[in-house]
Amino acid sequence: MNIPPIYTGSIVPLDISNIDTDAIIPKEFLQKVTKTGFGKHLFNNWRYTDHNNKILNPDFNLNKPCYRESTILLTRDNFGCGSSREHAVWALLDYGIKIIISSSFSDIFYTNSFNNQLLLITLDKTTIDLFFNLIKKNKINEITVDLIENYVFFEKKRYYFYLSNFHRMCILNGLDEIDFTLQHYKKIKKYGNQIPNFFVYNSIS
């Protein structure tokens, strides 16, 4: 999944710090390695009042009518901490989340996200506080992200975020690290075949 250079979407606030991967998707749902079908289990223990019958909790923001179509998640610091399960990223994407905005992310979650084209935007805590307050006060839930200039546009103001050229290229083109490497296969093969035989058993075929 790739994101266009300029993307506008609705934003859902989740005003909680240290959301770990078990909260994102509990371990009992990690029984397959395909990337689809996990969206219904996203935030399972918060999202449902009856977990067996999947009865929605009306007080949880993702279940409120004004946020049900949201594709951008706004949350607090240290999002994605805990175990390294990639299923957490799959659940977010399968639900429809394309972008997460926070003041910080777990390192492993950060890597897993970009390998699956889930865009993570890091802003300072003051800006995150401002966004939460604006949403609460004005009931605003639309935001624009410019991936070319690295700006978030919200309430007629823009906020810079850092994104490496490599991650930008992967997000815009729907690539992971392996896809990117394969784009340079011919150069890798040529270099490998130039290595003296005493360094390798066989040349790259």
Curated annotation (Swiss-Prot):
Name of the top EC class for this enzyme: lyase
Superkingdom: Bacteria
GO BP: L-leucine biosynthetic process
E.C. numbers: 4.2.1.33
This protein's UniProt keywords: Amino-acid biosynthesis, Branched-chain amino acid biosynthesis, Leucine biosynthesis, Lyase, Plasmid
GO cellular component, one term: 3-isopropylmalate dehydratase complex
One Gene Ontology molecular-function label: 3-isopropylmalate dehydratase activity
Xref: Pfam families: Aconitase_C
Catalyzed reactions: (2R,3S)-3-isopropylmalate = (2S)-2-isopropylmalate
Pathway: Amino-acid biosynthesis; L-leucine biosynthesis; L-leucine from 3-methyl-2-oxobutanoate: step 2/4
SUBUNIT field: Heterodimer of LeuC and LeuD.
Function: Catalyzes the isomerization between 2-isopropylmalate and 3-isopropylmalate, via the formation of 2-isopropylmaleate.
Similarity-based family: Belongs to the LeuD family. LeuD type 1 subfamily.
Classification via NCBIfam families: leuD, PRK01641.1
PANTHER family: 3-ISOPROPYLMALATE DEHYDRATASE SMALL SUBUNIT, 3-ISOPROPYLMALATE DEHYDRATASE SMALL SUBUNIT 2-RELATED-RELATED
Official protein name in the record: 3-isopropylmalate dehydratase small subunit
Organism name: Buchnera aphidicola subsp. Thelaxes suberi
